[in-house]
From Swiss-Prot:
GO molecular function per UniProt: GTP binding; GTPase activity; translation initiation factor activity
Chief location: cytoplasm
Region (G3): 495-498
HAMAP family in UniProt: IF_2_B
Protein name: Translation initiation factor IF-2
Stretches the record annotates as G4: 549-552
Region annotation (G2) ranges: 474-478
Gene Ontology terms: cellular component: cytosol
Gene transcribed to yield this protein: infB
Record organism: Lachnospira eligens (strain ATCC 27750 / DSM 3376 / VPI C15-48 / C15-B4)
Keywords assigned by UniProt, alphabetized: Cytoplasm, GTP-binding, Initiation factor, Nucleotide-binding, Protein biosynthesis
Pfam families documented for this protein: EF-G_D2, GTP_EFTU, IF-2, IF2_N
Positions annotated to bind GTP: 449-456, 495-499, 549-552
Compositionally biased residues, Low complexity: 79-93, 131-257
Positions of the tr-type G domain: 440-609
Length: 939
């Protein structure tokens, strides 16, 4: 038991810490409640304060002197001590108040009475307390007014445990007094004696005890008659939690002459108010008095007698109790009525909300005002809603569909995405042709290839062989397309050696040709434009027939051409592929007939058919403004039959056909499928690649043209906004507008092209497919830009530059053209664009030069460079490069930049300044300083 503290031993012995410290104070050692005790000290204390045997504590029985028996609630002691004890002769009321004595003589303590001799369990004494009632009653733990206490107990009271004699307490007997273990005297308390006196910690008239219990004129840690409390309580008839002075308390209850909880020093006035138990000569009345509360507050009159106080307290307490009970009932009734009303409103609200659900059809983008109009709410309500979400908007601000849907859902509106209708596509839309009306039509063939590989020579050879009809003078009319008759079968050739018209047609969705003839020189093999032509044809989805030209030359190597073309997916039939290879010679006319036969065979295999008995529909091949004839358009009729006098529309142009001229220069009145003709009668020059359609009337044709004009303007704006670039690629992927990323690669060597192509293709993911539509060697030319514009592609160039014309076209067509010197940078940029993390490009910009003139040393700073700015400016946030001769000695930030003693942000040319460099002091006079900043380069 060594090291037991004073307060622990005091608690065990049911005494105060001060009792122990006072006992041990004779020794030299100073003791506090937290001081440790040795075994010898503990033993001496136990011997001093050990309780006496119970048999010695039983007082002699005395006749009861109360007017009414009261039940004892302490079941352990209910059979002991049938009669109360007489008060000790030597103990007197120190106040000298005889009336107090008389009144005290009427008290009967239930501990000294048998349960069988008492009235019923819930006591009938009106001055009683709940389960422990009597006239000036007994309580379990914390009791007031002439009362019994539990542990450290005082005069006129009985104790709870192991108790009991008349007016006496556990182990200690005395007239009008209780002595727990070492406690003395009437109106006195443990270890301290005397009327009007205080013990242990807290003081008050008719004094206080140590902890939680109250006695007549005394309390433990709580308040007595005219006294103060232990810790947070004030004297003068008032205390927090437990009070004495002619009163009883249950736990948080107040007695007469006392103030409310946390009462003020000096306030009394027969007042009791705390919790639900009563004091002031009215010890609780919880059972017999309908939970009535105690007497009202009044100013205490020192001249008033205890009897008069008791009398007033009872009368006033009854009145006050009724009043408080009535107020409590009213408050409870009001509170219940409030709670009852709330649930009734909720179901009605929900039903209302279900009734007001609306369905909205929303476009891709709309303004706040338009959304509010569709929802039938005030625009200010939407602005407020967004403001509360931390978004500051105006009613004219545009939001996308997702944001609009989120707002609408909060207003109980269900949204559907508006299906965008392409008006032009609807106008150009065609119904399926019935099979029984379809007839075979001539194939449309385009000749493509590298420069000087013999495209023009091959066309001339075909024309010389099969074109018989010529105009007078022997000059063939060149209208951009012509027909060749091969054994009674017609073949239409498009005389478009360049790729501009071809890509323009594909850009507008027109399938102008059925078969592409790829001309490759047998002595040169595959060249850059050959690869470009292959990519164009594949992008258009047309059949490719390879014409290996110049086989008459000595160094011709057909097998080499076949081998080179296999790298681009064109594998000869005799090599196990599906591509037709025809060796020809435009010079000797060798292989021309075989080439034409293969064209007819391919057309037959593809089953090229059209319906001639319908309104005509075709494509504009070329168009020009003739001085004598006006707008002239060379067209290719693809479906139906076109007649002179038909009303037609071609994009934004319309008119009535006045004349038609065929490829031989003859005027014709009708033109069937796959027939090229020149038409006159349009109001303007149409663009190459526009769709030409016959209409029922000129008015209808004009209406179609006007629709094309208005929709064309909108499409131009949309195309400008949605042109593909790496910067905006991720947003377009997220919006679902991008499923395929087309890339054109140009490099200085073929190996770089192949390496990048394979690397970029591997970047494809679930949301977007990377597709390299063209890869070639050489500078970026206009044809590359036109292909990129038509295919909505990005051009990536390595160690090559675009020519002037290509740069102009790229700027005009808004084509994203990127130049790289390192392959991996391009791969990283495309990968970052796919992930939406494209970082801006920064480049170094030199802003100024300075010379170090003198060195200054400063403690704690290091070397300071005294400089003069010779050119430009030096800024505080710039990065400097210090050179000594041709050697760079430092590159890093400036730690400090001063002009005289002032820290500055910038020093201009001709100004002296002082500079300190971060973690660098090895500077010398005549060192040169170059300052630069990093600026973002527009991408």
């Amino acid at each position: 038991m060594a090291n037991m503290r004073v307060h622990e031993l005091a608690k065990e012995l049911n005494i105060t810490s001060k009792d122990i410290t006072d006992m041990l104070s004779n020794s030299e050692k100073t003791y506090k409640p937290v001081s440790g005790l040795t075994d010898a000290e503990i033993s001496s204390v136990r011997k001093k304060f050990a309780p006496a045997p119970k048999v010695e504590n039983k007082p002699a029985a005395q006749p009861a002197k109360q007017s009414q028996p009261v039940k004892n609630d302490n079941r352990d002691n209910r059979q002991q001590n049938q009669a109360p004890k007489q008060p000790q002769q030597g103990t007197q009321n120190k106040s000298g108040n005889a009336d107090d004595k008389k009144h005290i003589s009427q008290v009967y303590f239930p501990q000294n009475s048998s349960r069988d001799k008492n009235s019923r369990r819930d006591n009938n004494n009106r001055d009683g307390q709940r389960d422990n009632n009597g006239g000036y009653r007994n309580n379990d733990r914390n009791n007031g007014g002439y009362r019994n206490n539990d542990r450290g107990n005082n005069g006129y009271r009985n104790n709870d445990r192991n108790n009991n004699g008349g007016y006496g307490n556990r182990d200690n007997n005395g007239g009008y007094r209780n002595n727990d273990r070492n406690n003395n005297g009437g109106y006195g308390n443990r270890d301290n004696n005397g009327g009007y006196r205080n013990n242990d910690r807290n003081n008050g008239g008719y004094r206080n005890n140590d902890r939680n219990n109250n006695g007549g004129y005394g309390n433990r840690d709580n308040n007595g008659g005219y006294r103060n409390n232990d810790r947070n309580n004030n004297g003068g008839y008032g205390n927090r939690d437990n009070n004495g002075g002619y009163r009883n308390n249950d736990r948080n209850n107040n007695g007469g002459f006392r103030n409310d909880r946390n009462g003020q020093s000096g306030n009394g006035g027969f007042r009791k108010d705390n919790d639900q138990n009563r004091g002031g000569f009215n010890g609780g009345q919880r059972r017999n008095n309908d939970r009535r509360d105690s007497a009202p507050k009044e100013e205490f009159d020192f001249s008033a007698k205890p009897d008069s106080r008791r009398h007033d307290s009872r009368i006033d307490s009854k009145k006050n109790d009724r009043k408080r009970d009535n107020e409590a009932k009213e408050n409870l009734k009001f509170a219940n009525s409030r709670f009852d009303k709330k649930p009734m409103t909720k179901p009605e609200k929900k039903e209302k909300e279900e009734e007001t659900i609306k369905q909205l059809v929303l476009p891709d983008t709309l303004t706040i005002k338009e959304l509010a109009d569709k929802m039938k709410v005030a625009p200010a309500a939407l602005v407020k809603k967004l403001f509360l979400q931390g978004k500051v908007v105006t009613i004219n601000e545009e939001i996308d569909y997702d944001a609009a849907e989120e707002i609408a859902l909060e207003f109980n509106c269900i949204c559907e995405h508006e299906e965008k209708v392409d008006v032009i596509a609807e106008l150009l839309k065609e119904d399926e042709e019935p099979e029984d009306k379809l007839v075979p039509r001539p194939p449309v063939v385009c000749v493509m290839g590298h420069v000087d590989h013999g495209k023009t020579s091959l066309l001339d050879a075909i024309r010389e062989t099969h074109v018989t009809a010529k105009e007078s003078g022997g000059i063939t009319q060149k209208i951009g397309a012509y027909q060749v008759n091969v054994n009674g079968n017609l073949i239409t050739f498009l005389d478009t050696p360049g790729h501009e018209a071809f890509t323009a047609m594909r850009m507008r969705g027109a399938q102008a040709t059925d078969i592409a003839i790829l001309v490759v020189a047998a002595d040169d093999g595959v060249m850059p434009q050959t690869i470009e032509a292959i990519n164009h044809a594949k992008a258009a989805g047309v059949e490719i027939i390879v014409a290996v030209n110049k086989i008459d030359k000595p160094n011709a190597n057909i097998e080499k051409v076949k081998q080179e073309l296999t790298e681009y997916g064109l594998i000869a039939e005799d090599w196990g592929g599906s591509t037709t290879f025809v060796p020809v010679s435009a010079h000797t006319k060798q292989g021309i007939d075989e080439l034409l036969d293969m064209i007819l065979l391919t057309a037959e295999v593809n089953e090229l058919k059209a319906n001639p008995d319908r309104k005509a529909r075709g494509i504009v091949i070329e168009a020009e403004l003739d001085k004598g004839r006006g707008p002239v358009a060379s067209i290719l009729v693809q479906k139906g039959t076109l007649h002179v006098g038909d009303a037609v529309s071609a994009g934004s142009c319309y008119g009535k056909i006045r004349a038609m001229i065929d490829d031989k220069g003859n005027r014709v009145k009708v033109a069937g499928p796959s027939t090229p003709v020149e038409i006159l009668g349009l109001n303007d020059v149409p663009n190459a690649g526009e769709i030409i359609m016959a209409a029922d009337s000129e008015k209808e044709a004009r209406s179609i043209a006007e629709t094309f004009i208005s929709e064309g303007r909108k499409k131009l704006l949309d195309d400008t906004k949605h042109k593909v670039s790496l910067d905006a690629l991720f947003e377009q992927i997220q919006a679902g507008n991008m499923k395929e990323l087309n890339i054109i690669i140009k490099a200085d060597v073929q190996g770089s092209v192949e390496a990048v192509k394979s690397s970029l293709v591997r970047l494809s993911n679930e949301e977007v497919v990377v597709k390299v539509i063209h890869g070639g060697v050489g500078n970026v030319n206009e044809s590359d830009v036109v292909l990129a514009s038509a295919s909505n592609a990005i051009i990536i160039a390595f160690n090559v530059k675009p020519d002037n014309q290509a740069r102009i076209v790229a700027e005009r067509e808004k084509v994203d053209l990127r130049l790289y010197s390192v392959i991996y940078n391009a791969i990283e940029d495309v990968e970052a664009a796919l992930k939406g993390m494209l970082e801006p490009i920064y480049e170094e910009k030199i802003i100024g030069h300075a010379r170090i003139m003198q060195i200054f040393k400063a403690s704690g700073v290091g070397n300071i460079a005294g400089c003069i700015v010779e050119e430009g400016r030096i800024t505080r946030d710039s990065v400097v490069r210090i050179t000594r001769g041709s050697e760079k000695v430092y590159e890093g930030p400036i730690a400090s930049l001063k002009h005289f003693k002032d820290e500055v942000k910038e020093i201009k040319a001709g100004t002296e300044c002082g500079m300190v460099f971060e973690k660098f002091n090895d500077i010398q006079p005549e060192d040169m300083i170059e300052a630069h900043i990093m600026v973002e380069v527009p991408r």
